Amino acid sequence: MGFPYKITVFTPTYNRAYIIENLYRSLQRQSYTDFEWLVVDDGSADNPRELFERWQKENNPFPIRYVKQENGGKCRAINRGLELAQGELFFTVDSDDYLTDDALEKVAAWDAELPDKEHYCGFVGNRGTTPTETPNRLFEGRFLDGTALDRYTMVEPDQVLVDGERAFVFYTEVHRKYMYPEFPGEKFLTEAVTWDRMAYEGYKMRFYNDIIWIYEYKNDGLTKAGSKLFLN
């Protein structure tokens, strides 16, 4: 099928009205503009709707779509985003982080240079604490072809091939074949559930060292909260 946009920047959000503007401003600074910003609000209590209604009236080169749903967890929000996405590429970006100014330009370039696209489910950029600093291991060369399972492939006794937090970009049509399972009463499910299924079924990914996503850990972030949920 044809898509009206090259990229859907998808953001699931929950009680992030105090910080999501950082992401919005980074989208305004993008050097590439063939994208939409799709936000699924997973039952926030801090009323971000007012922010989005104001931003939708600003003169942006990209559309903003805001949808609110009953709180069901990040993966349910991603499922909703996949159903609504109008971009060929589906790039989930957390609401408390932001992108480098050339992030989407790089994503579009990676898509353009990818051979045999039918064998790939997408590609992966790097995350950093600044545009030039990352705690992640850098591999040799411009890119590395592999699968999501390379996050578990050991290259040294205490080192995996692809480590740390990464920025995953998927082909929307492929990701729609691998929606997240939904269980009654369960709100937390790791995204790796579908990434690994794609890998087991033969889909490759192309990994890049380039930093396109800036992050810092928050005390109330999903990674920390998820660890508590697993412990419980």
Regions found by a protein language model. Give the residues of each.
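N-proximal low-complexity "stem/linker" segments adjacent to membrane-targeting elements
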Residues: 1-26
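Short, acidic, metal-binding catalytic loop of nucleotide-sugar glycosyltransferases
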Residues: 25-34
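A conserved acidic beta->alpha catalytic loop
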Residues: 26, 41-51, 94
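Short beta-strand/loop segment that forms part of the nucleotide-sugar
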Residues: 34-43, 65-69, 95
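Glycine-rich, basic loop-to-helix element that forms the pyrophosphate-binding segment
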Residues: 69-85
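Short aromatic/hydrophobic "clamp" motif used to bind/position activated sugar donors
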Residues: 90
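Conserved donor NDP-sugar-binding/catalytic core segment of glycosyltransferases
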Residues: 102-139
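Conserved nucleotide-sugar donor-binding catalytic segment
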Residues: 129, 135-224
